[in-house]
Amino acid sequence: MSSDSLKKRKPKVNRNEDGKRGRHDEQEGRYYSEEAEVDVRDPREDYQLYKDTCLDLQRLMSEIQDLKNKGGKDSAMEIEEKKVQSCVHFMTLKKLNRLAHIRLKKARDQTHEAKQKVDAYHLQLQNLLYEVMHLQKEITKCLEFKSKHEEIELVSVEEFYSEAPATISKPEITSTDSHQQTLSRLDWELEQRKRLAEKYKECLASKEKILKEIEIKKEYLNSLQPQLNSIMQASLPVQEYLSMPFDCMHKQYETARHLPPPLYVLFVQASAYSQACDRKLVVTIEGNVEEARALFKPPEDSQDDESDSDAEEEQTTKRRRPTLGVQLDDKRKEMLKRHPLCVTLTLKCKEGSTLNLTFYFLMNLNILTVKVKIQPALELSTAISAGDLLNPDLILSCLYQGDDGKTTPNPANRYQFDKIGILSLNDYISELGHPYIWVQTMGGLHFPTDQPQPAVIADNALSASHMEKTINLLRARLLSRLSLHRQFASLEHGSIPVSLECQTLFPAKVISRLTKWNVITYEDYLALPYTKDVIECGLAKETDQYFYLLIERGTAKLNGVVVLNPGYCAVPPVFSLCLNWKGERSSSNDDNIRVMESEVNVYFKELCGPPPGFQLLTNQIQRLCMLLDVYLETERHDNSVEGPHEFPPEKICLRLLRGPSRTKPFKYNYPQGFFSHR
């Protein structure tokens, strides 16, 4: 082993049984102990020594390098001497390195000891903070403690001293001691409660006695029920004979309690109007009463609900999760759900025809809808052009102007539809019914257009103010459509029905004949060139019905299209004409055609006939036939053509032409029987 390795080894310390060093070890530690030397030496001086030693080493190395470069015999001794000096400096550097490591170890040990002390102090601090927090909680609990007597509402001090006996109040003691005063007040409260308990027992006994008397009277009244039922059954024929069905009305009123507010308002107001003004209006309630009662039942016991919900959760976890489409369909069905009960109005007409209106309430949309069913008194003949007249989806369209029943009147429904992906209520009208605005009014509902309101209260006054007018409009609409149906059946066969009351409006002989009558679409009407003026005036709408007619006499053909408003006959039909004879003539190029149109469109009041004016359309068509005769018979005859006139004059006219426009005399004067200008 080399001498350097011996120097690097730490001195061996032998300890005796008591853990103390031996004398030999103490002598070695006294001679050489670098750990002790570290405490004595100054680190700055060691650092300076380190720098000086490094400089000396650099110097010696450069000198040795110079000597080697020179070469020579004398320089070898000098190089060896300098090597020895360099080794001494290396030994010094090694010692300084060991001293630096010892200092580092001592600094780490001191830092570790200081850290342990800090951790110990920090742990003590945490324990003390926990104790402080625990004590604060205990103090808070003590401060928040409330005795039971604080929850008892005691009588006031003045009332206590005025009512309590002296044996309990003890004013000589309690007036100065608040604790004794509270105890005395509690004693007085106990005494009062004992007295009230006695009174309570007496009241319970009295209650039991009264309940027994009530049970006896109930049994007596129940024994009368079979007799009353037999009396009611015996009075049913009398009620039917007098048209006073009290029993049925009573059942209806019992069922009406389960109606939603809008249907209830409709039922009450319609029943009141029927009893007061219109005996031919029958109001009934239909639907499942049990389901309606279930809607108002209070929820069952919470425990049962919890057990049911747990069972449902277990089942749903086992089932497969429904897809998004199925969830949306379920939400739509729930959104469009109707109330189990509905109100039916049956309007009877004089001729025996009935109009059945069934009103439904959509609970989540908060709107009313109606479905229509028509029962004619007589079997109607089939007429192709009358196909949509009695269509349940169209017969009530535009009962009030602009109310086609294709959109929801509640603005809040738009936001509800957006959430579940419903684009329009029109797709579900065939199933739910039409939500006309007048239907909402009959139910007392009013929806402001400026702001959506999810909850609207049914108003009895609103329903009552519109009930009579709406019923009259409904009955008039049914009668007008039935009358039009019969008229269309005759028109399709080329016959124009004119009643006896209206015979005086036309001459005895009308030669022109109706040869064609059929229905056309709105698009077909728009495509005709001679309907442009009517379209520009806004007199033709999609909700109207359109018909084509052809009147012929000889080679002349009068083509006409009719705009039939749903409000016929309050709103008259509008005619547009085109004559095919010696060219095509219309109101745009022939003033007489324009005058013919005005005779039926402007002076329609002359053709209404007896009220309510259901013969207006057929009278207008008959007048067109008469006007075509006048037009053709007053036309100039070409003398260059030989042979008889195609249209010989048979009408008496005071003057054939008038004015620069050369208009013809189209006004018929009864009873003189001649034609003149207006």
From Swiss-Prot:
GO terms under cellular component: cytoplasm; nuclear speck
The answer on whether this UniProt entry bears the keyword Cytoplasm reads yes
- Biased segments, Acidic residues type: 301-314
MF-aspect GO terms: RNA binding
Function, as annotated, reads: Component of the THO subcomplex of the TREX complex which is thought to couple mRNA transcription, processing and nuclear export, and which specifically associates with spliced mRNA and not with unspliced pre-mRNA. Plays a key structural role in the oligomerization of the THO-ddx39b complex.
Quaternary structure per UniProt?
Answer: Component of the THO subcomplex, which is composed of thoc1, thoc2, thoc3, thoc5, thoc6 and thoc7. Component of the transcription/export (TREX) complex at least composed of alyref/thoc4, ddx39b, sarnp/cip29, chtop and the THO subcomplex. Interacts with thoc7.
Q: What is this protein called?
A: THO complex subunit 5 homolog
- Biological source species: Xenopus tropicalis
